[in-house]
Amino acid sequence: MLNQPPFLLSVYDYTGNWARPYIDAGWRVLLWDQHFEGSILEGFGRLVSLVEEENEGRVDGLLAAPPCTAFAASGARWWQYKDSPGSAEPPWESFTEQMVGLTLIVWEMVVRFRPRFWALENPVGRIEKLCPELKPFRRMSFNPCDYGDPYIKKTILWGDFNPNLPRNPVRPVEGSKMHRLPAGRRRSELRSVTPSGFARAFYKANHDLSINFASGRQLELFAS
């Protein structure tokens, strides 16, 4: 659309932290998170309609942070239960299968919306094993302390984007603070918060649309 600011779609972004620098810079941003909009699997048609209404079915950037509760190595002790039949509501056979579905729907977004850049993040774990489609797109890993937040939580990014983020390393004086969070639903929500320093660095490296971020390989691979 002529004379319109760029358009960003950010999914599984409960706090909006990852998208915040784009919002502050005047981008048009559509956030979707199950806490507010409901399941993206059930509401995918509505999401497509919203993108069509807002930007004629196209997005300039796509950010995705799918739930890590079935993937993160920190929760490996519960994998057996999450993999077991009956651990999720029908039509899913298991909780893990449902989480894989939430991850794989990102491929559909990439093919349908053809973003100029896209990125998917998850902590260290087994997501690549369960979603092998990710492997060709692994681009970088980081800890929050690399970008100004003084704690560690090793996170991996897949996608087609500029990985040359400006670093702002600080001492991780808070250590692995995620392990000290209290148990319960609130713990999962807090663990999923995108570090603000990383979000700013990602924006700085991935906002100038005159740069050709994408290699073009994603459409070829996803269509095969």
Positions of PLM-derived features:
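Conserved active-site and SAM-binding loop architecture
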Residues: M1-S224
